[in-house]
Amino acid sequence: MSKLIKGIAASDGVAIAKAYLLVEPDLTFDKNEKVTDVEGEVAKFNSAIEASKVELTKIRNNAEVQLGADKAAIFDAHLLVLDDPELIQPIQDKIKNENANAATALTDVTTQFVTIFESMDNEYMKERAADIRDVSKRVLSHILGVELPNPSMIDESVVIVGNDLTPSDTAQLNKEFVQGFATNIGGRTSHSAIMSRSLEIPAIVGTKSITQEVKQGDMIIVDGLNGDVIVNPTEDELIAYQDKRERYFADKKELQKLRDADTVTVDGVHAELAANIGTPNDLPGVIENGAQGIGLYRTEFLYMGRDQMPTEEEQFEAYKEVLEAMDGKRVVVRTLDIGGDKELSYLNLPEEMNPFLGYRAIRLCLAQQDIFRPQLRALLRASVYGKLNIMFPMVATINEFREAKAILLEEKENLKNEGHDISDDIELGIMVEIPATAALADVFAKEVDFFSIGTNDLIQYTLAADRMSERVSYLYQPYNPSILRLVKQVIEASHKEGKWTGMCGEMAGDETAIPLLLGLGLDEFSMSATSILKARRQINGLSKNEMTELANRAVDCATQEEVIELVNNYVK
């Protein structure tokens, strides 16, 4: 008899294969064992660190090839952990001062760090706790001489089942053999979920108990479309899901026909579908999926996973590569958005009680112009290689925009005096992420060339709900009428001044939100490249006039639930 296990759909698709249980290695040891050869034990620890660096470097290089530089940056962060004296020194001191064995010293110190980071109300710090756990496990395995599971050695078709997949586990998956995976823990924003989407393999996370309910070699089905795992399916279920898998692949193939098609509603209104990227490595997916431009180029990945700032020349080459590849299509580059959930080890940013509302993004750049000016110079120099738009993140006041623009114009003049060619067709815009900015959209619209609505932050700031907090996640409501009204206000303000508005948050590629955004008059929808063709098909089947009527009714609703019901009744 088959068994159904529910989880969170993390990556689309249907996988059918035997279960491969990722068995946790035995990393037990005697915590109370004292050592007499202290120097030898420190050397043993140092040797484990060096061996871990060698392994992680190989994994990092493989991840860059398979997943792109932005995903590989996770392992750059792991390598930095192994070089962090604030972590390494206390471990060595514990061995020397307490005669602790290397395994005990490592786990005691890293557990303290993990506990501190996990208690912080900060997404970046919580992710760093996971990084430290992953790195600590690898170092411990070398201390104990125990081999960690290596998914890259799998040589038959399987679905991986485990408690969780670490970033290094996921980076070693071979798409040829690993058909999908299912885990006990995790969410849609966990490292493993993000990487599964990059690898385009079906994945389900957060099942709570799958490792207790599946045995090695069980036949299982992973339905990444609905979040279902079927263990030991019946013959009828097997046939049904094989059919569902074939239909899924047929649908993907059918969508490819829309790659070069226009995005136009049934009543003739055009929309622009653009892609979000982190590095030039993301360009193949952008082109394969028929993006009409890049609506968000996150430049912070150029700064992450390294121990010093990128030079102006390094930045220039990265921006030039993207602009040339897009061949005249619009590329919207967001200036450095560091702080909040993204930090740089070499900047030594002050700790803050609430970093999401603190020293970050444009605030940091205006205060530290030695960071800001080289980026602006690199962008201006690259502008002659394509259609460049520049936008500033986290702008709260018109004076911030004016100051940023003044610095850019100053650097433009400097570059011209140095003999550089600069495009005269660069549009300057801002991210609308703060409710105050949306409220003054009419004021901003007189001075900016465009808006890009960053819904991820706009939603959590408007509803005062941390989207990473399970206790208040019910308040993170993309379809709340308050959000729709702010979006409408921003779009109308831009159109009144003859300007345009895009959206680059997750909402832009959401199938429930798309009809509403189309009706509200959104000009550009920027999303993950893999969502573009589905969004194009959806928009090409909608009527702009009908969606305008829908949106007008939606902003008058009282709750998110009413909005969802309204959309479901309109769009069937």
UniProtKB/Swiss-Prot annotation:
Superkingdom assignment: Bacteria
Task: Output the Gene Ontology terms for molecular function.
Answer: kinase activity; metal ion binding; phosphoenolpyruvate-protein phosphotransferase activity
| Record-linked InterPro entries | PEP-util_enz_mobile_dom, PEP-utilizing_PTS_enzyme, PEP_util_AS, PEP_util_C, PEP_util_CS, Phosphohistidine_dom_sf, PTS_EI, PTS_EI-like
| Pfam families per record | PEP-utilisers_N, PEP-utilizers, PEP-utilizers_C
Task: Tell me yes or no: is Transport among this UniProt entry's keywords.
Answer: yes
**What PANTHER family does the entry give?**
PHOSPHOENOLPYRUVATE-PROTEIN PHOSPHOTRANSFERASE
Annotated binding of phosphoenolpyruvate, by residue: R298, R334, N456, D457, R467
> So what family is this one in?
Belongs to the PEP-utilizing enzyme family.
Q: Which residues does the Swiss-Prot or TrEMBL record annotate as the active site?
A: H191, C504
Q: Which cofactor does it need?
A: Mg(2+)
**Source species:** Staphylococcus aureus (strain MSSA476)
Keywords per UniProt: Cytoplasm, Kinase, Magnesium, Metal-binding, Phosphotransferase system, Sugar transport, Transferase, Transport
Function recorded in the entry: General (non sugar-specific) component of the phosphoenolpyruvate-dependent sugar phosphotransferase system (sugar PTS). This major carbohydrate active-transport system catalyzes the phosphorylation of incoming sugar substrates concomitantly with their translocation across the cell membrane. Enzyme I transfers the phosphoryl group from phosphoenolpyruvate (PEP) to the phosphoryl carrier protein (HPr).
The catalytic activity of this protein is classed by the Enzyme Commission as 2.7.3.9
The UniProt catalytic activity note for this protein reads: L-histidyl-[protein] + phosphoenolpyruvate = N(pros)-phospho-L-histidyl-[protein] + pyruvate
User: What is this protein identified as?
Assistant: Phosphoenolpyruvate-protein phosphotransferase
Q: Which GO terms describe its biological process?
A: phosphoenolpyruvate-dependent sugar phosphotransferase system
Spell out the subunit comment.
Homodimer.
Cellular component per GO?
cytoplasm
Principal location: cytoplasm
